[in-house]
Amino acid sequence: MFSSGAGDLFQLLRDGRPRTRSELVDETGLARTSVVNRLAALTAIGLVTPTGTAAASGGRPAARLMFDQASRVCIGIDLGATHGTVGVLNLSGDVLCQESRVIDIADGPTEILTWAVNTAERLLAASGRQQRDLLGIGVGVPGPVEHSTGRPIRPPIMPGWDGFDIPAFVRRRLIATVLVDNDVNLLALGERATQWPAVDDLLFIKVSTGIGAGIILGGVLQRGSRGSAGDIGHVQVPGTANDRDLEATASAPAIAAYLSRDGAVNIEPGDVTDRIRMGDLTAIAAAREAGRAIGEVTAMCVSVLNPSVVVIGGQLGVNVQEIIAGIREVVYRRSIPLANQHLNIVPARGGSDAGIRGAGLMVLDERLCAAAVDELIEQLD
């Protein structure tokens, strides 16, 4: 027997397929009166809407109802170390509009979040929406986060952010639920939803100013007890000088520092990709070696977690094939054979909006779950 709540009935409709009341009766096993009452409640809170009629063999055609994906919106905010994106999404997680700019996360939470909130308000207005249409706001930041509070926990590349109450700051102007997570976790959610929806076990590795991983196992994002699951950037890499950690060995700043070591040129982290594209043999070799270092840590993750897919994203992960080549070389050699037998290691394909998509999905998963929908109905009463 199907669960009795309206929120449970709504979960069936989230696939976007229109259904008649009779079809829902057959699908759920509920009495017709129960289905009618639950649909009325879902319609009252704006989540379900009529959409035409179904063909009938005789008598009056039956009305069809479906999930109203345009009834509300959510906001996704993706903050990296050097780049920020804000977007408005519908209830299916489709991006309606977005805006990006170069940022420096070290400028601190007040400056960065003020820009993000200003941009969100402007995009909300541009999409013809008001705050009452806002279901929630998802925020990604480049460091460990205590998900239950939305506060960063000793983030290594985010000076001034430790313990900062991000939800409270955002809610000063945007009155809605605010959820915060590590940016790589949200990239993992966005990449899986758009590129690998049938894959339940996925590891997303971001290689950029920092290095981190998002872990999805059994279709569920894994955050760990304190939000540090996937914080591989500070894992020591065997065989490096003084057993340096992964970020100090293979991140964009680490490669730039290596290329600038003799003082003849000063390479910035953002220039690394260009040097490789120009055919700089030293830069190419450094990128390949960085990929091997990342591969050492990834091989351990693959052996322990046994994902079906490893996605390599971030500024270097997507744009520098030598990084992925180095990762593949080591992972297939060093991880246990059973774990890598059918393993795919691929560049990210979700595009520049994967982070805000993931932020939106985080909001939708929490605010449109069965219990949350039932709560919305109770509030209406």
Q: What are the functions of these language-model segments?
A:
Residues 1-53, 57-132, 174, 239-381:
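ATP-binding/phosphotransfer module of carbohydrate and carboxylate kinases, centering on a glycine-rich
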Residues 95, 152, 221-222:
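Hydrophobic "anchor" residues
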Residues 15-16, 194, 208:
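Short helix-capping/turn signature of helix-turn-helix
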